[in-house]
Amino acid sequence: MKYEWRKQEKNLYGVKQTPIIVEVPKQKYILVKGKGNPNEVDFSDRISALYSLAYAIKMLFKIAMKNKTDNEIADFTVYPLEGFWKKVNGEELDKNKLEYTLMIKQPDFITQEIFTKALENIKKKKPDALYDEMSFREIEEGKSIQILHVGSYDEEPKSFEQMNEFARKRDLTIIGDFHKEIYLSNINRTSEEKQKTILRYSVK
């Protein structure tokens, strides 16, 4: 049986273009931190390395489960790329100063041991210094506001304003100086105006 996040986790990923409140539980991620302009090569290199590790984890799990019954999960769909972005308050946006954490969620059944083994395998197969910066950890975002943004990343402020107004009307306060973005579209295959991104703030 194959675990498919689009079908199994509609409460988190089946988002509309209007703000909603969600409770985001503790979840497992592989992640790598970075700083600088997302249009630079370093950013795309981090994404490529992160995806390579994600697929190494998937393949290792499939091999381990190859003799299991049809009723057991033996495969899963790789989750979309996500990222925490540090907000820039009261300043003109300078992309060269952006700080971010790129991540790909992992199913609950992926363990630290599987991550460690997959990391060892990918280092041997595709040596890259970036793998030394990657980690496996659990993150709990808790009560959050999220919205589906359709369009270019430069137009995200319009969606953030909807979220801010939604929060104000409900006396909710945004926690921290960062927000989450979940990239549902393949930017290499999707035109800017059709790109789908989930935007999320933790609130209290």
Please report, for each region that a protein language model flagged, where it lies by residue.
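A solvent-exposed interaction/effector surface
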Residues: 1-204
